[in-house]
Amino acid sequence: MLERGAESAAGATDPSPTGKEPVTKEAPHQGPPQKPSQSAPGPTASAGSPPRPRRRPPPQRPHRCPDCDKAFSYPSKLATHRLAHGGARPHPCPDCPKAFSYPSKLAAHRLTHSGARPHPCPHCPKSFGHRSKLAAHLWTHAPTRPYPCPDCPKSFCYPSKLAAHRHTHHATDARPYPCPHCPKAFSFPSKLAAHRLCHDPPTAPGSQATAWHRCSSCGQAFGQRRLLLLHQRSHHQVEHKGERD
Protein backbone atom coordinates (compact mmCIF):
# COMPACT_ATOMS: atom_id res chain seq x y z
CA MET A 1 0.00 0.00 0.00
CA LEU A 2 2.75 2.47 0.86
CA GLU A 3 4.57 1.70 -2.41
CA ARG A 4 1.42 2.30 -4.50
CA GLY A 5 0.78 5.61 -2.74
CA ALA A 6 4.32 6.72 -3.36
CA GLU A 7 4.03 5.90 -7.08
CA SER A 8 0.71 7.75 -7.44
CA ALA A 9 2.08 10.75 -5.55
CA ALA A 10 5.14 10.97 -7.80
CA GLY A 11 3.09 10.81 -11.04
CA ALA A 12 6.17 11.61 -13.08
CA THR A 13 7.14 8.20 -14.43
CA ASP A 14 5.40 5.01 -15.39
CA PRO A 15 7.00 1.68 -15.79
CA SER A 16 7.70 0.85 -19.42
CA PRO A 17 5.91 -2.12 -20.97
CA THR A 18 9.14 -4.08 -20.90
CA GLY A 19 9.92 -3.11 -17.33
CA LYS A 20 13.40 -1.88 -18.18
CA GLU A 21 13.21 1.92 -18.42
CA PRO A 22 10.72 4.34 -16.97
CA VAL A 23 8.68 6.40 -19.51
CA THR A 24 8.27 10.10 -18.73
CA LYS A 25 4.73 11.49 -19.18
CA GLU A 26 4.33 14.70 -21.17
CA ALA A 27 1.99 17.46 -20.11
CA PRO A 28 -1.08 17.75 -22.38
CA HIS A 29 -1.05 20.60 -25.00
CA GLN A 30 -3.25 23.59 -24.18
CA GLY A 31 -3.60 24.59 -27.89
CA PRO A 32 -1.75 24.68 -31.20
CA PRO A 33 1.90 25.67 -31.07
CA GLN A 34 2.40 29.40 -31.35
CA LYS A 35 4.35 30.73 -34.31
CA PRO A 36 7.10 33.23 -33.67
CA SER A 37 5.97 36.81 -34.07
CA GLN A 38 6.53 38.20 -37.57
CA SER A 39 6.77 41.75 -36.30
CA ALA A 40 10.14 41.10 -34.75
CA PRO A 41 12.88 42.45 -37.01
CA GLY A 42 15.15 39.95 -38.66
CA PRO A 43 18.91 40.02 -38.67
CA THR A 44 19.06 42.10 -41.89
CA ALA A 45 16.41 44.74 -41.06
CA SER A 46 16.41 47.25 -38.27
CA ALA A 47 13.31 48.15 -36.33
CA GLY A 48 13.49 51.86 -37.16
CA SER A 49 14.41 51.70 -40.88
CA PRO A 50 11.57 52.21 -43.42
CA PRO A 51 10.89 49.49 -45.98
CA ARG A 52 12.78 49.79 -49.22
CA PRO A 53 10.60 50.97 -52.12
CA ARG A 54 10.25 48.50 -54.93
CA ARG A 55 11.62 49.47 -58.29
CA ARG A 56 8.97 50.07 -60.89
CA PRO A 57 9.37 48.09 -64.08
CA PRO A 58 10.13 50.17 -67.18
CA PRO A 59 6.97 51.21 -69.04
CA GLN A 60 6.04 49.09 -72.00
CA ARG A 61 5.73 51.05 -75.25
CA PRO A 62 4.69 48.53 -77.91
CA HIS A 63 3.08 51.04 -80.28
CA ARG A 64 5.84 52.59 -82.40
CA CYS A 65 5.37 55.51 -84.76
CA PRO A 66 6.20 54.55 -88.38
CA ASP A 67 7.37 58.11 -89.14
CA CYS A 68 9.88 58.59 -86.30
CA ASP A 69 11.55 56.67 -83.50
CA LYS A 70 8.99 57.45 -80.79
CA ALA A 71 6.89 54.73 -79.12
CA PHE A 72 3.79 54.87 -76.95
CA SER A 73 1.97 52.76 -74.39
CA TYR A 74 -1.52 53.10 -75.89
CA PRO A 75 -2.86 53.24 -79.46
CA SER A 76 -4.73 56.45 -78.65
CA LYS A 77 -1.46 58.19 -77.73
CA LEU A 78 0.08 57.05 -81.01
CA ALA A 79 -2.94 58.29 -82.99
CA THR A 80 -2.71 61.70 -81.32
CA HIS A 81 1.03 61.86 -81.99
CA ARG A 82 0.62 61.04 -85.68
CA LEU A 83 -1.51 64.14 -86.17
CA ALA A 84 1.72 66.13 -86.07
CA HIS A 85 3.20 64.08 -88.93
CA GLY A 86 0.07 64.28 -91.06
CA GLY A 87 -0.07 68.05 -90.83
CA ALA A 88 -3.51 68.11 -89.19
CA ARG A 89 -3.89 71.15 -86.94
CA PRO A 90 -7.49 71.16 -85.67
CA HIS A 91 -6.87 73.69 -82.87
CA PRO A 92 -6.60 77.23 -84.31
CA CYS A 93 -5.46 80.20 -82.28
CA PRO A 94 -8.21 82.84 -81.93
CA ASP A 95 -5.62 85.62 -81.88
CA CYS A 96 -3.51 84.81 -84.97
CA PRO A 97 -3.64 82.53 -88.03
CA LYS A 98 -1.61 79.74 -86.42
CA ALA A 99 -3.11 76.33 -85.67
CA PHE A 100 -1.85 73.41 -83.61
CA SER A 101 -2.14 69.65 -83.40
CA TYR A 102 -2.71 69.46 -79.64
CA PRO A 103 -4.69 71.62 -77.19
CA SER A 104 -1.63 71.80 -74.95
CA LYS A 105 0.40 73.34 -77.79
CA LEU A 106 -2.33 75.90 -78.35
CA ALA A 107 -2.41 76.77 -74.64
CA ALA A 108 1.36 77.21 -74.60
CA HIS A 109 1.21 79.38 -77.73
CA ARG A 110 -1.49 81.67 -76.34
CA LEU A 111 0.84 82.65 -73.52
CA THR A 112 2.92 84.45 -76.14
CA HIS A 113 -0.05 86.72 -76.81
CA SER A 114 -0.76 87.42 -73.16
CA GLY A 115 2.90 88.01 -72.34
CA ALA A 116 2.72 85.96 -69.12
CA ARG A 117 6.10 84.48 -68.20
CA PRO A 118 5.80 83.24 -64.61
CA HIS A 119 8.92 81.01 -64.67
CA PRO A 120 12.13 83.10 -64.51
CA CYS A 121 15.59 81.65 -65.01
CA PRO A 122 17.71 81.80 -61.84
CA HIS A 123 20.89 82.37 -63.88
CA CYS A 124 19.89 85.08 -66.37
CA PRO A 125 17.12 87.67 -66.90
CA LYS A 126 15.06 85.41 -69.18
CA SER A 127 11.66 84.09 -68.13
CA PHE A 128 9.32 81.53 -69.67
CA GLY A 129 5.66 80.72 -69.85
CA HIS A 130 6.05 77.02 -69.04
CA ARG A 131 8.26 74.96 -66.77
CA SER A 132 9.27 72.73 -69.67
CA LYS A 133 10.65 75.72 -71.55
CA LEU A 134 12.56 76.80 -68.47
CA ALA A 135 13.95 73.27 -67.99
CA ALA A 136 15.13 73.17 -71.60
CA HIS A 137 16.70 76.62 -71.23
CA LEU A 138 18.59 75.66 -68.06
CA TRP A 139 20.68 73.24 -70.11
CA THR A 140 22.26 76.25 -71.81
CA HIS A 141 23.82 77.13 -68.46
CA ALA A 142 25.08 73.58 -67.84
CA PRO A 143 28.87 73.17 -68.11
CA THR A 144 28.64 70.07 -70.30
CA ARG A 145 26.32 68.60 -72.92
CA PRO A 146 26.45 64.82 -72.53
CA TYR A 147 25.38 63.83 -76.08
CA PRO A 148 28.09 64.74 -78.63
CA CYS A 149 27.57 64.29 -82.34
CA PRO A 150 29.98 61.68 -83.78
CA ASP A 151 30.07 63.50 -87.13
CA CYS A 152 30.78 67.10 -86.05
CA PRO A 153 31.94 69.01 -82.95
CA LYS A 154 28.42 69.85 -81.78
CA SER A 155 26.94 68.33 -78.62
CA PHE A 156 23.42 68.29 -77.25
CA CYS A 157 21.53 68.09 -73.98
CA TYR A 158 18.96 65.50 -75.06
CA PRO A 159 19.18 62.33 -77.18
CA SER A 160 16.19 63.51 -79.23
CA LYS A 161 18.03 66.73 -80.16
CA LEU A 162 21.06 64.72 -81.24
CA ALA A 163 18.90 62.37 -83.34
CA ALA A 164 17.13 65.30 -85.03
CA HIS A 165 20.48 67.00 -85.72
CA ARG A 166 21.99 63.90 -87.31
CA HIS A 167 18.88 63.28 -89.37
CA THR A 168 18.94 66.86 -90.68
CA HIS A 169 22.65 67.46 -91.25
CA HIS A 170 24.41 64.10 -91.62
CA ALA A 171 21.89 61.68 -93.15
CA THR A 172 22.19 60.91 -96.86
CA ASP A 173 18.43 61.28 -97.38
CA ALA A 174 18.18 64.21 -95.01
CA ARG A 175 15.23 65.88 -96.77
CA PRO A 176 12.87 63.21 -98.13
CA TYR A 177 9.74 65.44 -98.00
CA PRO A 178 9.73 67.91 -100.93
CA CYS A 179 7.31 70.79 -101.21
CA PRO A 180 4.94 70.44 -104.21
CA HIS A 181 4.92 74.22 -104.75
CA CYS A 182 8.63 75.10 -104.62
CA PRO A 183 12.06 73.39 -104.76
CA LYS A 184 12.42 73.17 -100.99
CA ALA A 185 12.53 69.83 -99.16
CA PHE A 186 12.33 68.97 -95.48
CA SER A 187 13.44 66.32 -93.03
CA PHE A 188 10.11 65.78 -91.27
CA PRO A 189 6.46 65.85 -92.41
CA SER A 190 5.66 68.37 -89.69
CA LYS A 191 8.27 70.78 -91.12
CA LEU A 192 6.75 70.39 -94.57
CA ALA A 193 3.26 71.04 -93.21
CA ALA A 194 4.45 74.21 -91.48
CA HIS A 195 6.18 75.37 -94.68
CA ARG A 196 3.10 74.81 -96.83
CA LEU A 197 1.27 77.41 -94.79
CA CYS A 198 3.41 79.96 -96.63
CA HIS A 199 1.90 78.92 -99.97
CA ASP A 200 -1.67 78.50 -98.78
CA PRO A 201 -2.10 80.36 -95.47
CA PRO A 202 -5.29 79.34 -93.65
CA THR A 203 -7.68 81.77 -92.07
CA ALA A 204 -8.66 80.71 -88.57
CA PRO A 205 -12.33 81.35 -87.71
CA GLY A 206 -12.62 84.46 -85.61
CA SER A 207 -8.99 85.38 -86.20
CA GLN A 208 -7.94 88.98 -85.71
CA ALA A 209 -4.91 88.64 -88.00
CA THR A 210 -6.32 87.46 -91.33
CA ALA A 211 -4.11 89.84 -93.35
CA TRP A 212 -0.98 87.88 -94.25
CA HIS A 213 2.27 89.59 -95.18
CA ARG A 214 3.45 88.49 -98.62
CA CYS A 215 6.89 89.14 -100.05
CA SER A 216 6.74 91.26 -103.21
CA SER A 217 9.90 89.64 -104.61
CA CYS A 218 9.12 85.92 -104.36
CA GLY A 219 5.51 85.72 -103.21
CA GLN A 220 6.22 83.90 -99.95
CA ALA A 221 3.73 84.80 -97.20
CA PHE A 222 4.26 85.18 -93.47
CA GLY A 223 1.92 85.34 -90.52
CA GLN A 224 3.85 88.13 -88.84
CA ARG A 225 5.31 91.27 -90.33
CA ARG A 226 8.61 90.87 -88.53
CA LEU A 227 9.12 87.50 -90.23
CA LEU A 228 8.54 89.11 -93.62
CA LEU A 229 11.15 91.79 -92.83
CA LEU A 230 13.67 89.16 -91.72
CA HIS A 231 13.01 87.18 -94.90
CA GLN A 232 13.52 90.22 -97.14
CA ARG A 233 16.76 91.12 -95.40
CA SER A 234 18.25 87.63 -95.59
CA HIS A 235 17.00 86.56 -99.04
CA HIS A 236 16.59 89.77 -101.03
CA GLN A 237 18.93 92.18 -99.19
CA VAL A 238 16.10 94.64 -98.65
CA GLU A 239 16.72 97.14 -95.86
CA HIS A 240 13.85 98.79 -93.99
CA LYS A 241 15.12 101.96 -92.40
CA GLY A 242 13.25 103.51 -89.55
CA GLU A 243 10.94 100.52 -89.10
CA ARG A 244 10.72 98.37 -86.03
CA ASP A 245 10.72 94.60 -86.40
From Swiss-Prot:
Signal peptide: none annotated. GO terms for cellular component: nucleus. A zinc finger (C2H2-type) spans 63-85, 91-113, 119-141, 147-169, 177-199, 213-240. Keywords: DNA-binding, Metal-binding, Nucleus, Repeat, Transcription, Transcription regulation, Zinc, Zinc-finger. PROSITE patterns: ZINC_FINGER_C2H2_1, ZINC_FINGER_C2H2_2. InterPro entries: C2H2-ZF_domain-containing, Znf_C2H2_sf, Znf_C2H2_type. GO terms for molecular function: DNA-binding transcription factor activity, RNA polymerase II-specific; RNA polymerase II cis-regulatory region sequence-specific DNA binding; zinc ion binding. Residues 1-67 are annotated as: Disordered. One of its GO terms (biological process) is regulation of transcription by RNA polymerase II. It comes from the Eukaryota. The keyword Nuclease does not apply. Residues 36-49 have a biased composition (Low complexity). It is found in: Nucleus. Residues 52-63 have a biased composition (Basic residues). May be involved in transcriptional regulation. Belongs to the krueppel C2H2-type zinc-finger protein family. This is Zinc finger protein 575. The gene is ZNF575.
